[in-house]
Swiss-Prot record:
Binding site for ATP: 9-10, 17, 93-95, 103, 128-134
Entry protein name: Phosphopantetheine adenylyltransferase
EC assignment: 2.7.7.3
InterPro entries: Cyt_trans-like (IPR004821), PPAT (IPR001980), Rossmann-like_a/b/a_fold (IPR014729)
Cited Pfam families: CTP_transf_like
Organism name: Rhizobium etli (strain CIAT 652)
Entry annotated with the keyword ATP-binding: yes
């Protein structure tokens, strides 16, 4: 069984992330969505909230396939976390050339540290290319409509975080 490891902050999960996850299930039988925990950062959503939003979003997008996806936390090197979960593929989504430049550097370093783990780049669909979790958080915080960029569960969670 091929296991893929999809690391990110997912703060929050966006339609772009969901798009990449749908594609990832075409190249791996199992996908581990790995939420990075970084002590110096203050995410909008806690790990538990992010994990639940991922589960709810995927249940809607992939009915019947969520058993092939596991959500975990990690706070170490991506390749070490992937290896600990038995993954042989790293999944990375690409929106544009800027992402490609950065991700190629990361893939090279990961390959040097873990030649047994391959990085797979999955292109974002046209509709999800402009979406970033950072922009979603900023727009939502200012009362903007982010419904086109996030799954319904995330929209509801963002709305509940907005000050009245």
């Amino acid at each position: 069984m091929t296991t893929a490891f999809y690391p990110g902050s997912f703060d929050p999960i966006t339609n772009g992330h969901v798009d990449v996850l749908v594609q990832a299930l075409n190249v791996a039988e199992k996908v581990i969505v790995a939420i990075g925990i970084h002590p110096g950062k203050a995410p909008l959503f806690s790990f538990d909230e992010r994990a639940e939003l991922i589960r709810l979003s995927l249940a809607q997008a992939l009915p019947g396939k969520t058993g092939d996806i596991t959500v975990v936390a990690f706070d170490n090197l991506v390749v070490d976390a992937a290896r600990a979960h038995g993954a042989t593929l790293l999944i990375r989504g690409l929106r544009d050339g800027t992402d490609l430049d950065y991700e190629m550097q990361m893939a090279g370093m990961n390959r040097a540290m873990a030649p047994d783990i391959q990085t797979i780049f999955l292109p974002a669909g046209t509709a999800s290319r402009p979406i970033t979790a950072t922009l979603v958080r900023q727009i939502a915080a200012m009362g903007g409509d982010v419904s086109a960029f996030v799954p319904p569960a995330v929209l509801q969670a963002l709305t509940s975080k907005r000050p009245n």
